[in-house]
Structure formats: structure tokens, C-alpha cells
Amino acid sequence: MKRNQRKQLIGTVVSTKNAKTATVKVTSRFKHPLYHKSVIRHKKYHVHNFGELVANDGDRVQIIETRPLSALKRWRIVKIIERAK
């Protein structure tokens, strides 16, 4: 996959209990095609949380798709948008 075609998402760190791994919850909003109601969906991603950018619970982060790092991890943190209070 070319570097400029990698998917980027913004989400909130839910868990940092695993070593070098954070769980990020990404929320997406769309309009239902038949009922025209606004629907909210959530998805959790296992993200590489190691090195210079170490996120904590509650942080808002930007993640990017990368090569498989383990059985579940295919994302890494690009930047921390907002720290938890």
C-alpha cells in the first residue's frame, strides 16, 4: 500500500492495560439510507503505543494504518490531538 493511501482515523484511547498496545474507540456518524435517522457506530482498534508518542486513557489521538505488527495490531499512533484532563 502506498504511503499516501493509508487510512487515517481519529479516536479516543479506551484502554492502555496491554504492554505497548492501546485500544482506541473510533466513532462514526452516518444517516440511515431508509429511515434518514442519524446513526452512531463505534469500532475499537488495537494500536501500537510505544516510543515517543505514548498515549494514556482518555487521550484523543490520530491513528494511521500500517503493516501487521501482531495478530491484532495494524494501526499506530501518528499524533496526540488532545490529552485527557
UniProtKB/Swiss-Prot annotation:
Coiled coil (residue ranges): none
GO-annotated molecular function: rRNA binding; structural constituent of ribosome
Give the domain of life.
Answer: Bacteria
Secretion signal, residue range per the UniProt entry: none
Q: How does it assemble?
A: Part of the 30S ribosomal subunit.
Describe the task this protein carries out.
One of the primary rRNA binding proteins, it binds specifically to the 5'-end of 16S ribosomal RNA.
Query: Could you identify this protein by its name?
Result: Small ribosomal subunit protein uS17
Organism listed in the record:
Mycoplasma genitalium (strain ATCC 33530 / DSM 19775 / NCTC 10195 / G37)
What are the leading ranks of the lineage?
A: Bacteria, Bacillati, Mycoplasmatota, Mycoplasmoidales, Mycoplasmoidaceae
Name the gene.
rpsQ
